[in-house]
Structures are given as structure tokens and as C-alpha cells.
Amino acid sequence: VIVMKFGGAAVADAAGIRRVVALVQAERARAPVVVVSALAGATDALLAAADAAAAGAGEQAVAALVARHRAVAGELGLPPAVVDDAFAGLAELARGLRLVGAVAPRLRDEFVAFGERASARLVAAALAIAGTAAAALDAGAAGVVTDDRFGAATPRPDAARMRAAVAAVAGVPVVEGFLGRDARGFVTTLGRNGSDVTAALFAAALGAEELQVWKDVGGVCAADPRVVPQARRLAALPPAVALALAACGSRIVHPDALAHAAAAGVPIVVRGIASPAAAGTRIAADAPPPTGVLAIGHDEPGDPPAPTGGFAALRANAAARGGALVGLIGAPATLGGLVVAAAARALATGGVPVFAADSLPDGGAVAFAVPAASVRRAVTLLHDCFLAA
């Protein structure tokens, strides 16, 4: 068994869903379980539609969402009923929000859940029409039980139920990412990028051979390739190094997903949709440990805070001063005073002031608080200092 997770960018449109179908079919012999996010932009659109509905103006936003999904279904050769069934109840929920005039956290989760619900049904139907039997799975009903902290629920997975739900599917299970249900059966969400967590929970419950996380980048690089195009791809990482990258702002894999997979001994392989034949990056306990500075992570100004407790105090300090973090990740024995001093010199010489610095308790990363407008320059300076060929 393998688990294949596809984010919103991968299922953004009919062409993307066709690529997903081809990738899943290529792995059919390995008994894939698929986890999908909502179509790109659908979650934000649903959140906005919920607020609009509470203000008495949600009908147009809901209609636009349904129309977008219907258009994708049409391009895939699927009947409108696939989308209409997925969105059944959304218009009624919007009318209820209009009457109440506010969006309670529980109702917000119920509203936003329609994104993953529609995506899973579109992908399952696209697989079926391409000749591969598939069925969409309600993650909460399938065993992703959570607490009732709506919007950022903590999973308390029922592994036996998850295995039974997967086994009951005559074909490829397509699981709604990001979603769960609390003990009362109410829909909950796992927080931003929570589909990674869903995928890791299923990989752990199933004892999967590997968890494939399919992205628009072909693996984990030594620095963000949008900032440093020549940054080299990292072939393998220990989970602790991947977690240190996440603490420094990397959004490649959700840190909770890294932790769940590592605890279960399931390797994560980050693969690129645009280059499916490439090896990607393998995150596993048997990966060689770093021997020096390995990578540079950074916060992306304007993004929500990184979903990890690492560097929380430093990040808050930086935010209070209009700043963000850039960090060095590597061997704890390497990231000592000399490296920190060299990094500070490189930043100062390049005109990037440092507000403060801190390191992780295990010494696997050191981060610097710098002005948000200078984050990308800081990444380039540190890459040139430590990682340039």
C-alpha cells in the first residue's frame, strides 16, 4: 500500500486532474490510497462565501463555486450530478447563515468542507471514467476522529476504522483531505495544509510502504528555488532535518505530517507533478545525517505563521518589528558560534540587519530575525555564503 497526496495546485483544473489520474493509474499495482485537497483557491473562496452568506450576500459566491466545479466536470466528461451531489446542502447552509447573521466556528468548518468533498468526488469519478474503479471517502466517517477545536482540530485517529474503510472500497479510495469529525459527528478541519496530515494519518494506520506528497516543485531544495533558482535538490533528509526546515518556514510538508509519518516509520517522498519521473526527495529515518550547513529556510512575508512551535518566540519578536525569519539548517555540531558569526557577517555586508537570533534545542537550526522586505535577499546571501558551488 502507498498513500498519494495531491494538493490544490495539482487538482486545480481538468488538466491537473487528468495528470493525477495518470499518476495514480501508474501506481495501481502498489494499491494506492489517494488523499486530495480542494481545488486551488476553493478553500479561500468558500471562507469568503460563508462570510458573504452571513452578511446576506452569499448566493452569487456559492453559485460561482458550483459553476467552476461543474465546468471542470464537463471538461472531464463527467455528468453535472457529480458536482451537484457534492455540493448538496451548501445553498441551504448559506441560507441558514443569512438568517443567523454570523458564522460560528462549527458552521465555518461545515461550510469549507464542501471544497474537499467536491474534489474527492471529481477525482474518483475521473478515475472511474478512465477505467480505474474508485470511490470518494468521507475522512471523518472513515476514522479521522478529532477533538472539537473547529478550524484547527487535533486528530485522534481510529486506525482500525481507517483500515476497514479503505478495505471496503472496491478500487482506489479517494480520501477528503483536511477534514475530520468530532465525537458528536460534526465536521472539523485540521488547519491550513491539513491534507498533508490526513495523508500521514492514513499512511500510519495502513503501515504504508511510503507516502508520496505531490507538489508543484520536484522535491526539497537547499533553498527556495523561487529565490535561488540554482539551489540543488536534496535527495534524502532525516525527519529531524525536515522538521527543522519547517521550523524555519518551509511549507513543503506540514510538520505534523512529518511527525506522524516518522513515528510510524513511513518514508515520505516529495515528488513533482511536472517531473513525475524524477526521484524527488525522500524523508526517512535511514537518510544520512547532514555534515555541515545543508539548507536555508525562510518565512514568506504575508503568509500565515509556520504551523510549528519551533522559533515561536523569535518569530513573534520579528513580527512585532515588521520582520520575518531566515534560518540555516544542518548538523548540530556545525551550527556553532563560528557559523553564526559568518552568517551575521554575510547578512551585514549585504545590507540586511539582524534583529535577533536563536537556535533549536537540538542545535539543528539557527534562525535570524530580519526585516520582512529583506528576507529574500537574506536567503540569497546565506546561500552564496554557505552553499554556492
What are these model-derived regions, one by one?
Residues V1-V253, L258, D362, V366-S374:
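Nucleotide/pyrophosphate-binding catalytic subdomain
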Residues T132, V266, V352:
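Short phosphate-binding/catalytic loops that engage adenosine nucleotides
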Residues P238-T291, G297-P304:
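A conserved active-site cap/scaffold subdomain adjacent to cofactor or substrate pockets
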Residues G280-A389:
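A conserved regulatory-domain signal marking ACT and ACT-like small-molecule sensing domains
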